[in-house]
């Protein structure tokens, strides 16, 4: 293949750079077009998520209750980091530290308004790690704390800093909702 070195080669190079630049380039400080996607999520014990009294619960939904299943809304920030929410991205999952206690909260925030470069939005960021068919989510604000469920059904979705403990489940199946 021969490289063209004519009078317009610099102009062509510039146009190609502009055409193929990253989607966040040219947007102010971390603002980028957000593409929210909805996913089905269930843990390795087949428990799905549902909302009860403004708390995210993991349990076995059957029959007419299957319509209570919450889809997880996800906005990718970069290759591994994501924002997670429910209810069309209007309630976002966050990791909050209070003294020695670290807990998962649902906050009324629009997921597409979050900004990866804002320190106050760090609590909404999760590191998505895939291992084979399963996915785990580690808090960026609280390293070592993972999204988890318990072995028992109908308990709150929470965070754990002991992901290998046998009574917690930190591996999830994650499938784009059709």
Curated annotation (Swiss-Prot):
Location in or out of the cell: Secreted
Signal peptide: 1-26
Disulfide partners: 92-142
GO MF terms, alphabetically ordered: cytokine activity; interleukin-1 receptor antagonist activity; interleukin-1 receptor binding; interleukin-1 type I receptor antagonist activity; interleukin-1 type II receptor antagonist activity; interleukin-1, type I receptor binding; interleukin-1, type II receptor binding
Glycosylation-annotated residues: 110
Gene3D superfamilies: 2.80.10.50
Keyword Secreted part of the UniProt annotation: yes
GO biological process: carboxylic acid metabolic process; cellular response to norepinephrine stimulus; chronic inflammatory response to antigenic stimulus; female pregnancy; fever generation; immune response; inflammatory response; insulin secretion
Keywords: Disulfide bond, Glycoprotein, Secreted, Signal
InterPro entries assigned to the protein according to its UniProt record, in alphabetical order: IL-1_CS, IL-1_fam, IL-1RA/IL-36, IL1/FGF
Domain of life of the native organism: Eukaryota
UniProt keyword annotation of RNA-binding present: no
GO cellular component: extracellular region; extracellular space; vesicle
Pfam families: IL1
Function summary: Anti-inflammatory antagonist of interleukin-1 family of proinflammatory cytokines such as interleukin-1beta/IL1B and interleukin-1alpha/IL1A. Protects from immune dysregulation and uncontrolled systemic inflammation triggered by IL1 for a range of innate stimulatory agents such as pathogens.
Assigned protein family: Belongs to the IL-1 family.
Protein name: Interleukin-1 receptor antagonist protein
Gene: Il1rn
């Amino acid at each position: 293949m021969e490289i063209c070195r004519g009078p317009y080669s610099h102009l062509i190079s510039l146009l190609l750079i502009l055409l193929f630049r990253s989607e966040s380039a040219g947007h102010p400080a971390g603002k980028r077009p957000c593409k929210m996607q909805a996913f089905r999520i269930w843990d390795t014990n087949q428990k799905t998520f549902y909302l009860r009294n403004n708390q995210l619960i993991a349990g076995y939904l059957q029959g007419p209750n299957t319509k209570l299943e919450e889809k997880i809304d996800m906005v990718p920030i970069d290759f591994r980091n994501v924002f997670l929410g429910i209810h069309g991205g209007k309630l976002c999952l966050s990791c909050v530290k209070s003294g020695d206690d670290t807990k998962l909260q649902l906050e009324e925030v629009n997921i597409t308004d979050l900004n990866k470069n804002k320190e106050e939005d760090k609590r909404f960021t999760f590191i998505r790690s895939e291992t084979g068919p399963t996915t785990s989510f580690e808090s960026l604000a609280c390293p070592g704390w993972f999204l988890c469920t318990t072995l028992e059904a109908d308990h709150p979705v929470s965070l754990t800093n002991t992901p290998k403990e046998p009574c917690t489940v930190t591996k999830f199946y994650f499938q784009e909702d059709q």
